[in-house]
Amino acid sequence: MDLVVVNALIREEVQKPNSTTQERTDMEYNTTIGVDVSDKTSKICVMAKLPGGERKIVVETTCATTKDGFEEAFSKFDRSWPVIFETGTHCRWMDKCFRNLRFKTIVANPGKIPSITKSNKKNDRNDARELARLGIADPEMLHPVILRDEIFQKMLRLHHARNLLVSQRTQKVNQIRGFAKSVGYRIECKTTEGFHNQSKALWPKELEEVAWPLMDSLETDNLKIKAYDKMIEKLAEEPEFKAMVERARVIYGIGIIGSTVLIATIGGRPNRFTHARDVGAYLGLVPQQDQSGEVDKQLHITHAGSDICRTALVECAGVALMSNAPETDIKLKGLRIAMRGGKTAKKKAKVAVARSLAVTIVALLKDMTKEYIPLSKAGEEGFKRYHAELEYLTMQKAAKKEKAEKKAKAA
């Protein structure tokens, strides 16, 4: 079906009399193209809006999920019709392909479209129809996303690859420690980077055949991780990254890994957030809510957004909260939360500091001329009160312990 036939079909539907309106042939109408993508084939639905508000499916077809397949199928369609498809593995190259064909693209966020994710009749054809229908009804209902530039996507790919190697190295180290404990041997090395430097002569013979092949692979993993670190550092020197990375690293605890992964995750566009604090929800570092009346449950964080970015920020938070770290407003916030006590107080403190780090970085990137003050006067006073309270609590614990010891001796 060529473009002339498709346009004729749309014109014919528009010119039909409608039971609720007078016959009109000059009314404008909208046409959208919904595409539901799978690895091998994609479903295409062209939908037009008629004068009475009715939506008519004009064309439904299938094409191969390849550049050639899309070029052949979309050569029949008018370039003024927007192409709507979901985020996913193929969305980046598809967006580039459609733009090269001079189509406007709308990349939908399926996680925020209940009519697709929670449909009882979910299939590829219906998904393509729903995308086209929502594009006509209200494009904002598609929750459009802006894809990152290639250089930021490249940085994220480097971080994903590095993160995979780091997790594999950690699994190997834990497995070797488990082998050692099973034969009554304890490995003293505390760092994963130097774990492979263990002396073979000091190891029990029962572990040689099992553990040493893993130890050799650890050395290879370390070399690969260092290679990725160098690639990340090199890419961070590019103009798109350099100024923002230097700006982010003025905050204690933020290194090359934490700064680059956050900048890449937000696509180098800090102004996408109306308020800097919005980045906390974007990265899933805010708690879920379930409140009704007087009941307000304490829930876990949402874990939305990028896992590797969230993990990197939590690791940076651990550095910022170390005892030898300088006193900052961010550190004070974490120490206050940790002082509350309880099983999860320290974890909550890390998450809160991670969120504060992300918010502070975005605020600095939104205004590159703003001066960063690590510790304000209010923060200085806060640390004085914190140390006084900590000393008081320490004395209380010591008094309770002494009282318990006296009671035990008397018994």
Predicted regions: what is each one?
Residues E246, V250, I256-G342, K346:
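Phosphate-backbone recognition surface of nucleic-acid-processing proteins
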Residues E294, L335-A411:
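Low-complexity, acidic/Ser/Thr- and charged residue-rich accessory regions of DNA metabolism proteins
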Residues D138-L156:
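Short, charge-rich amphipathic alpha-helices with coiled-coil/heptad character
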Residues E28-K49, L131, L165:
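Gly/Thr-rich phosphate-binding beta-strand-loop-beta motif of the actin/hexokinase/Hsp70
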Residues P51-W81:
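Nucleic-acid-processing active sites and adjacent nucleic-acid-binding tracks
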